């Protein structure tokens, strides 16, 4: 039983190594951006549709490799054009809010040009702003569309419809009204409003001035052409996402949706959820998302699809409302919304409350352990607003967690201290019963009972730290609030690895290490490794040589493992190790137990000197 505690430590440590190793070596960093540069040049007379009748994009819209306007039939197709050229193909109404800028094309009335004012590609404010939505004709179109589908209703608004606008600006407090008459008795009016953050409200009115009843189905969709670059981590979902009524959260990666059965036509796969009430659908990246939000009290059909057009994969999430029948001289109004922006936690929650959007908070991937990650974020966010620095918030939350678990940790360390005090008796028992394991275990148990020692109590501090570690890791990895959040000194982004490198002596040598060098080891991972080394040297080495070797290499393994982890996580671990060392030192001194740190360090250097002398 004497080695049970050590075996437990080894098992826990090895489990962590396996988990971190899987993350580091298998899931890996970001996968290659999959740019699609070719698309079928087949001429089409009408837009293809999914099984629910919602339009699916086609090459004739001016996408990659579609013939340019004015090109003769059979002429060579041109490739994607710049965003500027694509935007210039249609008259546009400008979007300008405190958080967004962009435009809506009057041709098609899609929301297909949105950039984020307050977010940049890198830490530098001089770097380009984040571009979220882009029109067809660019390399990777990404847009939202609203409209109506139906049979025997005459022409309906589509990607080629030219709308009339009542103004040249869409801004908070300045809605935009678009109108179009199909010439056969249907008049369409669309009022688009935007708030000061990331929510568009689209109010569609249709009036039937004909002599016949008309049945229409309102829809909204988010469409993305080409598979984007993804992070490729198992702790993060990127791709198609939605909440579909009672079916709850649905998450489909770009690869997964393409494995679904055929849906509505050739080269289209997907899945639909029918007759659901409450929810939303969209496409999400790590920090950004676009989501179509139907009326929450009316049933709808939601769908995720992938359509192959030439070499291009087109991903689409859509909602289609129930039928609306318009009698002659009757009208109908449908209100839908579009979220297009940064996944700010407080803003997402505010939208959920304001508009009653079912489980809109699941737009952020809190994971299975949301009951840990959400409180962790709340605590960090609270102290950030109090102190103004997320790094300091991490240190303070770690200290509070230490104080919260102090009774458990104290009992564990007291038990460990008692165990050290009886080490001579334990050694004597092992020698006395070295040939009889049963009697040895019985004698050990009697000793533990006599001295009131829990042999596995020392495992609790480690076990407690594991869920906290992963909760903090999740928060650092998924929340945009941590993106580009500085600490002090060289740490300007707590969500990114320590930017320094041992390869150039942490910046002392005048060159930047090339990215292909597999060793990424900065200052903070080394500090963490040192604190872990000191913590392990507080205890005597395990008697088993194999276990001793495992413990000796553990700080080195974790130092390299955490080299590519977010700096905030490494800072947390180093700080937590430091607090643990202080706590253990105080408890051991109070219990009259000798602290082994200095003896272990001296012994290590003596062994090193003896080995060097022997080789000499």
Swiss-Prot record:
InterPro entries: Membr_insert_YidC, Membr_insert_YidC_N, YidC/ALB3/OXA1/COX18, YidC/Oxa/ALB_C, YidC_ALB_C, YidC_periplasmic_sf
Gene3D superfamilies recorded: 2.70.98.90
Signal peptide per UniProt: none
Compartmental location: Cell inner membrane
Pfam family, one: YidC_periplas
GO CC annotation: plasma membrane
Membrane-related topology note: Multi-pass membrane protein
Principal subcellular localisation of the protein: membrane
Cysteine pairs bridged by disulfides in the record: none
Bias type Low complexity, positions: 36-51, 62-80
Keyword Cell membrane: yes
Family membership: Belongs to the OXA1/ALB3/YidC family. Type 1 subfamily.
Name this protein carries in UniProt: Membrane protein insertase YidC
Protein source organism: Methylorubrum extorquens (strain PA1)
